[in-house]
């Protein structure tokens, strides 16, 4: 009976451990993002409230059709210098393929605005 209680206690402790999706001190912003370019910039990133467990973080992002990411900076709705969270293998999200010249032009404008914001923050 004692061994059962010890095993049950250890099992509860193992499953009840909190999960830090972004343990990297630099890339510590947990975001739900859409497409990106080589993890340099991710688009349409939003902060979502989630429990500190892995499946809820992934599920929260999946509800909006996005993927969990850990980013260095979030400016406007873009995540800069991002990576997949610990324990997560996202599908290839570095496939941003704008349809038409207007979308590409808008994308380049957004990137320019983000870089200006970063420069303003650094000054």
Curated annotation (Swiss-Prot):
Name the UniProt record assigns to this protein: Class II hydrophobin 2
Q: Disulfide bonds, which pairs?
A: 22-70, 32-61, 33-45, 71-82
Q: Where is the signal peptide?
A: 1-16
Which family does the UniProt entry place this protein in? Belongs to the cerato-ulmin hydrophobin family.
- Cited InterPro entries: Cerato-ulmin_hydrophobin (IPR010636), Hydrophobin_sf (IPR036686)
Question: What CDD domains does UniProt report for this protein, alphabetically?
Answer: hydrophobin_II
Q: Which domain of life is it from?
A: Eukaryota
Q: Where in the cell is it found?
A: Secreted; Secreted, Cell wall
Principal localization reads secreted
Describe, as the record does, how this protein assembles with itself and its partners: Homodimer. Homodimers further self-assemble to form highly ordered films at water-air interfaces through intermolecular interactions.
Underlying gene: Hyd2
SUPFAM superfamilies, A to Z: Hydrophobin II, HfbII (SSF101751)
What's an example GO cellular component term for this entry?
extracellular region
Keywords of the record, alphabetical order, are:
Cell wall, Disulfide bond, Secreted, Signal
What organism is the protein native to? Bionectria ochroleuca (Gliocladium roseum)
Q: What function is annotated for this protein?
A: Aerial growth, conidiation, and dispersal of filamentous fungi in the environment rely upon a capability of their secreting small amphipathic proteins called hydrophobins (HPBs) with low sequence identity. Class I can self-assemble into an outermost layer of rodlet bundles on aerial cell surfaces, conferring cellular hydrophobicity that supports fungal growth, development and dispersal; whereas Class II form highly ordered films at water-air interfaces through intermolecular interactions but contribute nothing to the rodlet structure.
> What induces or represses this gene?
Expression is not affected by carbon nor nitrogen starvation. Expression is neither affected by a deletion of Hyd1 or Hyd3. Expression is induced during Bionectria ochroleuca self interaction.
């Amino acid at each position: 009976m004692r061994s059962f209680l010890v095993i049950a206690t250890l099992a509860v402790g193992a499953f009840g451990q909190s999960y830090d999706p972004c343990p990297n001190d630099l890339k510590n912003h947990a975001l739900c993002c859409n497409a990106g370019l080589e993890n340099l910039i991710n688009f349409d990133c939003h902060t979502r409230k989630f429990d500190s467990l892995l499946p809820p973080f992934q599920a929260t992002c999946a509800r909006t059709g996005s993927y969990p990411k850990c980013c260095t900076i979030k400016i406007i709705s873009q995540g800069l210098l991002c990576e997949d969270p610990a324990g997560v293998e996202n599908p290839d999200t570095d496939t941003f393929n704008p349809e038409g010249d207007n979308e590409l032009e808008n994308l380049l404008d957004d990137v320019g605005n983000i870089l200006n914001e970063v420069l303003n923050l650094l000054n």
